[in-house]
Regions:
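N-terminal lobe of the biotin/lipoate ligase/transferase fold
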Residues: 2-168, 188-190, 242, 337-341
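Long, positively charged amphipathic alpha-helical accessory segments at protein N-termini or as interdomain linkers
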Residues: 1-31, 40, 44, 146-152, ...
Length: 341
């Protein structure tokens, strides 16, 4: 655990009581300079730490502190309770870190949570804005018995799990924009990225890394210009203390039983019901071919998007790895529409 994380844990455990720099340094076995640097870094991340001469430092009561213990304490008895939880301050990307560990033989069920990412990625390698103090970024290592074409099921069950957990926490309706975006009031509040490594001989997945990035609040200074009008937040005001741990645990409590069960029955109909694109016209973008417009009919049993390019033409199922879709009308972002088979 870093000095920064140890200082945060000590201040959180003090429950608002002041701890002197000397007390912190001796308790952690570090220098007072290291403590001061950790305090400065925590303040830069948005933690409200008060300093009083001759008394020391205190973390304001009610601060939303995220650590592995807080997440573990909220895991329900059952399959999810055995998950291995790690929380870090910052990484280039949680997916990249877990993929490296998967290649070294790390076990299924390892969960890596970061409070910020310096090089977060979304689909097609696009940057994923991951600032400190306003989001939650987590990845889960899986070793599923699935073929490559079935990997989209992981994203679908994760989307349903994340939507359930987010709705419980923020109280607002959450929709899913195929294949991997959670939306609140027309704005993206969560992105999901599943990356997999395949065994070429068997055609089955060797492992998959499921990543989820949530916007809990609008970041300090607002959204970057390129995300204005696109990105949104789960909470209009700062969430209650413990919300990040509750969200992480909520996702795991929902996702892990679905994943272990391996059945579509637990999530497919809800994934369809929460879809925002059904009944709307979209622009279909396939690599190397001109874009085409199509009407979305629904989602099939393999979580592919079923579209019709011309009235009366044969419906076509689109896989997430071969296309991107872009709604042609803004109402497709706003509320779930009942879907057809």
């Amino acid at each position: 655990m870093s000095v920064k994380a140890q200082v945060l844990a000590a201040l959180d455990g003090a429950q608002g009581r002041y701890l002197s720099g000397q007390e912190l340094a001796e308790g952690l076995g570090v220098s007072r300079t290291a403590v001061w640097k950790a305090i400065s870094a925590l303040r830069a991340d948005g933690y409200p730490i008060d300093a009083v001469t001759n008394r020391g430092y205190a973390l304001r009561r009610g601060t939303d502190v995220l650590n592995a213990g807080a997440v573990r304490a909220l895991l329900e008895p059952g399959p999810a309770a055995a998950l291995q939880i790690e929380v870090v301050d910052r990484l280039p990307g949680t997916n990249a870190a877990l993929r490296a560990r998967a290649a070294q033989g790390a076990p299924e069920g390892l969960v890596l949570i970061a409070q910020a990412q310096s090089a977060g990625r979304g689909r097609s390698g696009r940057p994923f804005f991951s600032p400190p103090g306003s989001g939650l970024y987590m990845s889960i290592l899986l070793r599923p018995e699935l073929g490559a074409r079935q990997a989209v099921r992981i994203t679908a069950m994760a989307a349903v799990s994340a939507a359930r957990a987010a709705e419980r926490l923020c109280g607002a309706e959450i929709g899913i924009k195929w294949v991997n975006d959670l939306m609140r009031d027309g704005r993206k509040v969560c992105g999901i990225l599943t990356e997999a490594s395949m065994d070429l001989e068997s055609g089955m997945l060797d492992h998959a890394v499921l990543g989820l990035g949530f916007n809990l609040t609008e970041p300090a200074g607002g959204w970057p210009e390129e995300l204005e009008g696109i990105a949104g937040a789960l909470f209009e005001d700062f969430p209650a203390p413990g919300s990040r741990a509750a969200l992480a645990a909520g996702v795991l409590n929902e996702f892990w039983p679905l994943y272990r069960a391996g059945s579509r029955d637990g999530y497919l109909e809800e994934y369809r019901r929460r879809q925002l694109l059904t009944g709307h016209t979209v622009e279909v973008l396939r690599p190397g071919t001109p874009s085409r417009t199509a009407r979305v009919l629904g989602v099939d049993r393999d979580c592919r998007l079923v579209v019709q390019f011309e009235p009366g033409s044969t419906p076509v199922a689109l896989g997430s790895g071969e296309v991107r879709v872009r709604p042609t009308d803004s109402s497709a972002h706003k509320s779930p529409t009942a879907l057809t088979e």
